[in-house]
């Protein structure tokens, strides 16, 4: 409440796709993308436990499809959330998403931790099979803000690195402002 004041009650359209369609109609909006809120912290929280991370991503995507549909009536396009921490897994999950008429995928704005313990940019050559498949599919890539793993920058400057959604400390914000532009830069610079 300190950050936002009194909040409006949760609208049924936040949790029900038919109510969301009614809101879209009332607002004159043809269609929308839907992105995860709390889901954007999964990769950072679980990157050192690859089986748990991949299971969490898979479960999240199945839940989104069950609850909202990855493509509901060509009007609500829910993003499947993928990671390149395991390219073979990402290709399997992309294939599943495409089979469920997915039109947009979401990725974390960060490098990924490979099975060998080394970090790789999104544009790293090891990820080329995924980018080729995504390009062939012709669907949209979204890079969503969230816990990008930039806590090391905050630690370096003596700040509390714990990620807290909706809490904004000026120095912390300035030290971690660039994950999305960094991710896009890696894709451009490495030829994706």
Residues covered by each model-derived region:
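Helix-coil boundary/capping segments in enzymes
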Residues: 1-192
């Amino acid at each position: 409440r300190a950050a936002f004041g009194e909040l409006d009650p949760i609208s049924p359209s936040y949790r029900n796709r038919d109510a969301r369609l009614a809101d879209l109609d009332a607002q004159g909006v043809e269609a929308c993308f839907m992105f995860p809120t709390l889901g954007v912290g999964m990769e950072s929280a679980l990157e050192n436990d690859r089986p748990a991370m991949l299971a969490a991503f898979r479960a999240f995507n199945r839940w989104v499809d069950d609850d909202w549909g990855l493509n509901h009536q060509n009007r609500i396009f829910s993003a499947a959330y993928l990671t390149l921490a395991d390219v073979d897994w990402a290709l399997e999950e992309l294939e599943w998403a495409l089979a469920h008429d997915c039109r947009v995928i979401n990725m974390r704005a960060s490098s990924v931790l490979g099975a060998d313990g080394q970090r790789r940019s999104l544009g790293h050559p090891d990820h080329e099979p995924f980018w080729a498949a995504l390009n062939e599919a012709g669907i949209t890539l979204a890079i969503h803000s969230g816990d990008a793993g930039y806590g090391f920058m905050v630690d370096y400057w003596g700040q509390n690195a714990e990620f807290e959604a909706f809490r904004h400390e000026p120095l912390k914000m300035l030290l971690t402002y660039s994950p999305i532009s960094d991710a896009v830069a890696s894709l451009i610079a490495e030829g994706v």
